């Protein structure tokens, strides 16, 4: 018998899930997790969307593609429609594509939409805080030491450059760089940066932060190198990052 799609509404979400699935079994956990993420995201961005976020909890990557109409198989995808912000995510025993990332995309598209994919993903990674359970800043430190570091300047200026880099490198670096901007210069400047985008990122950064993009990156690298990690922490991070 084919599973039946069900629906439940919470304060800020509408969840779709199928009967007899892991998603149904763990639905209350998912609801609590996402509502907590929603509060943290909206508190930081100082913004609450008018519409609820719509979630489709799917069994497989293939099902995500089929139901969403997305062009290829994926664990999660967000359709940035302000009237119907919709997230399709895999949720099964092995993969649970929930948490901050896709919700950040759905919420920020209304108040901190960036024309740069690097900044777009960087904001989501700022909330994720880690890649494969390794803090973004520690990932970045490893890449700097191992000469695998990719410059945020280049990733921000050209989407094609960002897309050409392995996710395990580009995503945590941009997450750490976004944390640097937010922690040191505040959310208002960051939102101003996104709203002021005019195809000239270097000029926009200079106008908003009164510093060049390169100067900000230099400060960021100095901050990363000034953090203290034990040899064991660095070695453990390397093993995880380079094992895949």
Predicted features along the sequence, with ranges:
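Juxtacatalytic substrate-recognition/specificity segment
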Residues: 2-116, 201
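Acidic/His/Gly-enriched intrinsically disordered linker/tail segments
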Residues: 69-83, 90-94, 110-244
